[in-house]
């Protein structure tokens, strides 16, 4: 699920309805919302943002992507609540002083275990490195991208040329009544 925010140059409700209808034809859309004051269209779903923009640029060449992100924003309130419940240090008891001393004594064995685990991790990382070497994708140069955008925005209406026959040259045009 993605949340896509697009900026459109719409002027009236008719253009708004046309934009909503155009976007709604794409598969994978859960909800569509339009903010006419800010001229922003919000699309939520699994649809590809590039497809949405290319579909809208046929009618509105100045369509731009403002934001592409997750559909639901992370909830900060839930994260803050556990901190408040366990907030602060627990009350000190008489039995805690020996535990802290025990921790100091037990730190040396933990460091040795970490070194052993660290050695295993390094070996694991060495094994993972040859497998995880994706080939870098080279993006096209910016000037080519601008030309492609200009070409897609230019959508001329094709006119059909008809041959106009002369009546004088057509033998079937002569009729005797």
Swiss-Prot record:
InterPro entries, per the entry: HIPP, HMA_dom, HMA_dom_sf
Keywords: Lipoprotein, Metal-binding, Methylation, Prenylation
GO MF annotation list: metal ion binding
Residue ranges of every copy of the HMA domain listed in the record: 1-68
Biased composition range(s): Basic and acidic residues: 72-129
Protein origin, superkingdom: Eukaryota
Protein name: Heavy metal-associated isoprenylated plant protein 39
Source species: Arabidopsis thaliana (Mouse-ear cress)
Organism taxonomic ancestry: Eukaryota, Viridiplantae, Streptophyta, Embryophyta, Tracheophyta
């Amino acid at each position: 699920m993605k949340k896509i925010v697009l900026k459109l140059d719409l002027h009236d409700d008719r253009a708004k309805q046309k934009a909503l209808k155009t976007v709604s034809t794409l598969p994978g859309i859960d909800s569509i919302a339009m903010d006419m004051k800010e001229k922003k269209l919000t699309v939520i779903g699994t649809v590809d943002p590039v497809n949405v923009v290319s579909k809208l640029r046929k009618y509105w060449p100045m369509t731009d992507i403002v934001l592409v992100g997750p559909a639901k924003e992370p909830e900060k309130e839930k994260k803050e609540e556990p901190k408040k419940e366990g907030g602060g240090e627990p009350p000190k008891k008489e039995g805690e002083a020996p535990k802290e001393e025990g921790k100091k004594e037990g730190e040396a064995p933990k460091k040795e275990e970490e070194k052993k685990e660290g050695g295993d991790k390094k070996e694991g990382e060495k094994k993972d490195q040859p497998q995880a070497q994706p080939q870098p994708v080279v993006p096209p140069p910016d000037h080519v991208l601008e030309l492609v955008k200009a070409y897609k925005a230019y959508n001329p209406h094709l006119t059909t040329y008809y041959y106009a026959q002369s009546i004088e040259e057509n033998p079937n045009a002569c009729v005797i009544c």
